[in-house]
Each structure stands twice: as C-alpha cells, then as structure tokens.
Amino acid sequence: DIVFVCVQTPNNIETNSVDTKFLESAIKEINNVNNNDLVITVKSTIPPYEIEKVCEKVGMDSSKLTFNPEFLREGTAVEDFFKPDRIVLGGTDSEKLTKLKELYSGFDCEIITTDSISSQLIKYLANTYLPLRLSFVNEATRLINYSGGNLDDVLKGVGLDNRIGQHYFRPSPSWGGSCFPKDLVEVNNFYDKDKLNLPLISNIINSNDIHADWTSENIKELYESKKLEGVVLIGAAFKEDTDDLRNSPTTEVFKKLKSSIENVVVFDEIINDENIVKFDYLEDLNSPHLFVLMYPVKELTLDRLNKIIEDSNSITYIPWSL
C-alpha cells in the first residue's frame, strides 16, 4: 500500500518560515497505524531538513519516507496530473522507491529517481525559476517602456530564440498566488546568508514588489493625464482560469490605487465569494473610465466589455501593455 501526504505547508506569518503543523498532524496519524510495508510518500512542499524535525517530533524514522513533489498548476491540475512534464521520486529506501515507480509505470514522461533532498530542491528551484522568469519579463517591460520600444515586438523577438522560448514570457502587473511567494521565502530561509551569497534569488521578491509599484503608478498617471472619473481593473484572481485571490496582484494594485483614486473597482466574472460585494457597475458607466486588463480573460468577458466600450465614447481601454 502507498499513502500520499498531500497537506498544505503555508508560510507562518509570525516566524516568516514554513508552517509544518498540518504535515506533522498527518505524519503522526499515519505513524500510529504504520507497518514496515507501507510506503509513505510526501507530496507536500517541504524545505530540506525540515521533514527530519517533523519526524523527530512524532517518533518516526524519516529515512523510511519517500517524496513525490507535485507540480500541478491551478486551473489545469487534472491535465497536469495525467500529462506531467516529469515525475520526481525521492528517498533512500530502494524497495519503497521501486513500488512507487511501479505506480507511475503507465505515465508517458521521464521519471527521475533521486535522494530526498534533491527531490525537495527540484520543486523549490522550479518555483524559484518561474517567478524569476516572470520578474525578468516585467523588468524588461519597464526598460522597453522607458526606451520607447514596441513591447509586443521586442518580447516576441526575444522569445522566438529557442533557447528562451515564448512560454511564460509575457508582462504582467506582478506575480502572486499561493505558491511562488511562500516558496521563495522558504528558499531564502533555508541557507546561511553568511556562507552563501545568492544575489539573484534573494532579490526576486523585491523585484516583484517594485514592479507592482510601477504598475500602480503607470495606471495612476494615465488616469490623471486623461482626466478620467475612475479605474476598472479586469480580473480579480492572481491569474486567469482560477478564482484564487491569494496574493493577487490585482488586490495589491487596487489597494495602492485606492489611496489616491476614489473610484476604483474590480471586474471579474469567475470569482464567486460571499465576502465580495457584487453590483452592475459596468452597465451603469456614464463617465470616462480607464479599463485595465490585468491578465488574459475569456472571450465572453471581452465581448461584453467591448460592447460596453462601443456604447460609450468616453471609456479609455488598455490591454496589459503599460
């Protein structure tokens, strides 16, 4: 038998480190009924050496654990599970790893079998590189804007280099979500700053914060220069095809704009949260507003917006291309 541990490992706000209480609870419960033949596989994201601390608390030998980090994306999780880019297995017990590998024998992708620490690092460094790539595009966006270049043409020309690629290579208000921010914090926490200098990795979050400020300032400047009556941010979640508001760039931009612009609203057709006040603000627009597309949205939303814009000559509309 194989037991998968798939519990959250959020960031503890007070200590700014990984919170292992859910993982500890799950491991403890499994340990109470454990037998030597049971393959315990941790899919939860956990920094190197933290699992040893958890196992010590519950009286379990950490060397008996196997690891199988998940790489599912919100909005495409089912497809990602059945069609993964790769499967990573980690551990020191070869017999348990063999059983785990047999479970995935029907999957058409490379299976990487490695040690526990390496399997954990693969997940963390993947979630470090992706926001690094997004931050590069956003910094490039600011440089292109400053230089007066054509944003779409420049990014396409760079991305067509097959060493770079166009996937995950578009500008955004900033990046967010439930994984990238916390994983980057944890990466920067599990190495000794006195012994290891990682200037690139240690500044990714700062780059993102700077870009969020830049986004807000550009929206504000455009709003003021055109003497508009309000701003409509289109898309509330942290990315398209999800309703997850955690660490949403839209939320951050909204807060920054709200301090100086009275009429700032967020338009979203996917979010269904009882804590959000809903009203047909868009249908009642009769004064000049700035529409900002925070990320690509579905055709239905764009068709509705285009109809509203057609019916009003006083609306300024910009896709994400500040």
Predicted regions and their residues:
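Structural/interface elements that position substrates and couple domains in central-metabolism enzymes
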Residues: 1-322
